[in-house]
Each structure stands twice: as C-alpha cells, then as structure tokens.
Amino acid sequence: MATASAVTAWGKPTIKSGASGESGAIGTTLEDVGKIKENTTSLELVKGNVNELFGEGHELVDKMELEGTWTLKFTVIKASLDKIAKFFGLSVSTDKLAMKTTIVSEPRSYTVDPLLVGAIGAELPYCYTSITPKFATAEGWTIEFEVTTMEPESESVAPATLYVKKAAAQASSQSTGK
C-alpha cells in the first residue's frame, strides 16, 4: 500500500555496500561505508540515449528513448588505509598499502537508507563502482564514490528499488506489555 505523502528525506543517509548477490540480486552482507561528508550524497536517474529519426526539412519521424541508469555519488571522510584497501580488494601490510589496482572489479550492492521514518530510500543491487582516494589539507584523506547501476543478470531483479523507511520494531518487552 502506498503512503499518501512522503516525508522529506533530509540529510544524513546511511549508505551500505557489499558484494552483489546471485544473478545480480541485492547482496546479503552489506556494511556501512563510513562517515559521509556533508552535502555530498546524491542519487539521480541519468536518462538513456535518445534515438531520433528525421525526414527532410528536419521533420521528426520517430523517436525512442532507451532505459537510463541510476547514479549514486558520495564522499567518505576520515578514510583509513584499511577502508581504502577494502573497497579495492587489497590488503594493508605493516601500515602500508601497495596500490596495485585502482579498479573495483566486482559488482557491488548499495542501499541508501534515509534518516527519517516515512522517507524514501533506495536499493541498488548490481552496480559498477568508481572510487577515487583523495588527499587535501583541509579534509585529510577522503574517498569519492560514483556508483552506476547495471542491468542485473536476472530479469526478476530491478536495477533500482525505491522504498519507504519503516519504524524499527519496538523492543519485545514493550510489545508484550511488560
């Protein structure tokens, strides 16, 4: 059942990520990505290619828009070597990280969970992830993420699912009247 009106999804979402599940389904083990820099999170639909067929005199004869993709962008602050290594699938050795790759090779799942109950969140089950570790004297080490949905292997899995955040279940002692 849809809600009549949505709660505004003000800042401070919780973003979790992990390996994608079987056939492109949402992963079963997702972990918090860490502290997110203020006002860096965005999730938007990027429209697909538009094909247009014109006749003489620039008369539009036919038009077709292809499916788009969702793009999630955010920046993780206070990044540690362990955090950087984890996203690249590398290991830290004696307080050093040999950056043998700058590519996230495996598809990942993401959830964007809003702070407020009743606000809209998103599940992105099968994504390409581009990350950029960055150092600036004003912020220290950060990790910039750009996540793009891909078509899951299974046709029964949607590239993105929007949901309304529900209240957490009350403690069992409250529900039993104790």
Model-derived segments and spans:
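Solvent-exposed edge beta-strands and adjacent loop segments
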Residues: 2-84, 124-142
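Beta-strand secondary-structure signal
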Residues: 71-75, 109-111, 144-148
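Beta-strand elements of well-folded, non-transmembrane domains
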Residues: 76-80, 114-118, 149-153
